[in-house]
Amino acid sequence: MVLRDRFTAAHPVVHPEIPAINGIAYVMFRQAGADGQTRTATVMPPGRLDRSPCGTGSSAHLASLHARGKISVGETITTRSVIGSAFEVTLLGVTEAAGRTAILPRISGRGWRFGETLVESDPSDVFASGYAVTDVWGPDAATLDPDG
Protein backbone atom coordinates (compact mmCIF):
# COMPACT_ATOMS: atom_id res chain seq x y z
CA MET A 1 0.00 0.00 0.00
CA VAL A 2 3.07 2.22 0.27
CA LEU A 3 3.26 2.36 -3.53
CA ARG A 4 -0.40 3.41 -3.74
CA ASP A 5 0.06 6.11 -1.10
CA ARG A 6 3.18 7.53 -2.77
CA PHE A 7 1.54 7.61 -6.18
CA THR A 8 -1.58 9.28 -4.78
CA ALA A 9 0.54 11.95 -3.09
CA ALA A 10 2.41 12.67 -6.34
CA HIS A 11 -0.62 12.40 -8.66
CA PRO A 12 -3.91 13.37 -6.96
CA VAL A 13 -6.86 11.63 -8.59
CA VAL A 14 -10.34 13.19 -8.50
CA HIS A 15 -13.43 12.19 -10.48
CA PRO A 16 -14.23 15.04 -12.92
CA GLU A 17 -17.92 15.19 -11.96
CA ILE A 18 -18.07 13.71 -8.45
CA PRO A 19 -15.24 15.17 -6.31
CA ALA A 20 -16.14 12.85 -3.40
CA ILE A 21 -14.73 10.02 -5.52
CA ASN A 22 -11.02 10.57 -5.21
CA GLY A 23 -7.77 8.80 -4.53
CA ILE A 24 -6.61 5.37 -5.58
CA ALA A 25 -8.24 2.35 -3.96
CA TYR A 26 -6.26 -0.53 -5.46
CA VAL A 27 -2.99 -1.14 -7.25
CA MET A 28 -3.05 -3.57 -10.17
CA PHE A 29 0.12 -5.16 -11.47
CA ARG A 30 -0.23 -6.46 -15.04
CA GLN A 31 1.82 -8.72 -17.25
CA ALA A 32 1.06 -9.46 -20.89
CA GLY A 33 1.11 -13.18 -21.57
CA ALA A 34 2.41 -14.83 -24.74
CA ASP A 35 -1.18 -16.01 -25.32
CA GLY A 36 -2.45 -12.41 -25.50
CA GLN A 37 -4.09 -12.59 -22.10
CA THR A 38 -3.15 -10.18 -19.33
CA ARG A 39 -2.16 -11.64 -15.97
CA THR A 40 -3.14 -9.39 -13.07
CA ALA A 41 -2.43 -9.09 -9.37
CA THR A 42 -4.58 -6.49 -7.65
CA VAL A 43 -3.57 -5.38 -4.17
CA MET A 44 -6.30 -4.07 -1.85
CA PRO A 45 -5.97 -2.58 1.65
CA PRO A 46 -4.40 -3.56 3.92
CA GLY A 47 -2.35 -5.64 1.44
CA ARG A 48 -4.62 -8.46 0.28
CA LEU A 49 -4.54 -9.89 -3.24
CA ASP A 50 -7.86 -9.88 -5.08
CA ARG A 51 -8.79 -13.38 -6.18
CA SER A 52 -10.67 -12.00 -9.19
CA PRO A 53 -9.13 -10.24 -12.20
CA CYS A 54 -10.71 -7.03 -10.78
CA GLY A 55 -13.40 -5.41 -12.91
CA THR A 56 -12.38 -1.87 -11.97
CA GLY A 57 -8.73 -2.47 -12.80
CA SER A 58 -9.59 -4.40 -15.96
CA SER A 59 -11.73 -1.45 -17.10
CA ALA A 60 -8.85 0.94 -16.38
CA HIS A 61 -6.51 -1.34 -18.33
CA LEU A 62 -8.94 -1.33 -21.27
CA ALA A 63 -9.12 2.49 -21.12
CA SER A 64 -5.32 2.77 -21.15
CA LEU A 65 -5.07 0.39 -24.12
CA HIS A 66 -7.63 2.47 -26.01
CA ALA A 67 -5.89 5.75 -25.15
CA ARG A 68 -2.65 4.33 -26.60
CA GLY A 69 -4.40 3.15 -29.77
CA LYS A 70 -3.89 -0.54 -28.97
CA ILE A 71 -7.57 -1.54 -28.94
CA SER A 72 -10.65 -0.46 -30.88
CA VAL A 73 -14.40 -0.51 -30.26
CA GLY A 74 -15.72 -4.07 -30.47
CA GLU A 75 -12.46 -5.73 -29.41
CA THR A 76 -12.15 -7.93 -26.32
CA ILE A 77 -9.25 -8.62 -23.98
CA THR A 78 -8.93 -11.34 -21.35
CA THR A 79 -7.61 -10.57 -17.89
CA ARG A 80 -6.65 -13.42 -15.58
CA SER A 81 -6.11 -13.29 -11.81
CA VAL A 82 -3.41 -14.88 -9.66
CA ILE A 83 -5.64 -17.95 -9.19
CA GLY A 84 -6.49 -18.19 -12.89
CA SER A 85 -10.03 -16.81 -12.90
CA ALA A 86 -10.77 -14.79 -16.04
CA PHE A 87 -12.78 -11.78 -17.20
CA GLU A 88 -13.56 -11.01 -20.82
CA VAL A 89 -13.45 -7.21 -21.13
CA THR A 90 -14.99 -5.70 -24.27
CA LEU A 91 -14.78 -2.11 -25.46
CA LEU A 92 -18.42 -1.40 -26.35
CA GLY A 93 -17.92 2.26 -27.15
CA VAL A 94 -16.29 5.56 -26.42
CA THR A 95 -18.06 8.50 -24.81
CA GLU A 96 -17.29 11.67 -22.89
CA ALA A 97 -17.48 12.52 -19.18
CA ALA A 98 -16.92 16.12 -18.09
CA GLY A 99 -15.13 16.92 -21.33
CA ARG A 100 -12.83 13.90 -21.11
CA THR A 101 -12.75 10.80 -23.25
CA ALA A 102 -14.25 7.79 -21.45
CA ILE A 103 -14.92 4.19 -22.41
CA LEU A 104 -17.97 1.95 -22.15
CA PRO A 105 -16.67 -1.48 -21.07
CA ARG A 106 -18.52 -4.77 -20.72
CA ILE A 107 -17.08 -7.28 -18.28
CA SER A 108 -18.07 -10.93 -18.46
CA GLY A 109 -16.93 -13.65 -16.14
CA ARG A 110 -17.87 -15.63 -13.12
CA GLY A 111 -17.79 -14.62 -9.48
CA TRP A 112 -18.67 -16.38 -6.26
CA ARG A 113 -20.15 -14.90 -3.13
CA PHE A 114 -18.06 -15.53 -0.08
CA GLY A 115 -19.78 -13.32 2.45
CA GLU A 116 -22.72 -11.10 3.18
CA THR A 117 -23.29 -8.41 5.75
CA LEU A 118 -26.53 -6.73 6.70
CA VAL A 119 -26.45 -3.59 8.81
CA GLU A 120 -29.78 -2.22 9.96
CA SER A 121 -30.92 0.49 12.31
CA ASP A 122 -34.33 1.06 13.83
CA PRO A 123 -35.68 4.51 12.90
CA SER A 124 -36.87 4.99 16.49
CA ASP A 125 -33.38 4.32 17.96
CA VAL A 126 -32.08 7.67 19.23
CA PHE A 127 -28.53 6.26 19.16
CA ALA A 128 -28.76 4.68 15.69
CA SER A 129 -25.59 6.45 14.54
CA GLY A 130 -23.65 5.61 17.71
CA TYR A 131 -23.04 7.34 21.02
CA ALA A 132 -20.38 8.79 23.25
CA VAL A 133 -20.13 8.16 26.99
CA THR A 134 -21.45 11.67 27.67
CA ASP A 135 -24.59 10.81 25.69
CA VAL A 136 -25.39 8.04 28.16
CA TRP A 137 -24.06 9.43 31.43
CA GLY A 138 -24.54 13.13 30.71
CA PRO A 139 -22.01 15.97 30.63
CA ASP A 140 -21.12 15.45 34.31
CA ALA A 141 -19.97 11.83 33.80
CA ALA A 142 -16.42 12.81 34.80
CA THR A 143 -17.63 13.68 38.31
CA LEU A 144 -18.42 9.99 38.88
CA ASP A 145 -14.68 9.27 39.09
CA PRO A 146 -13.72 9.67 42.75
CA ASP A 147 -10.11 10.38 41.74
CA GLY A 148 -11.10 12.72 38.91
Report residues per predicted region:
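Active-site proximal loop and beta-alpha junction motif in alpha/beta enzyme cores
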Residues: 1-148
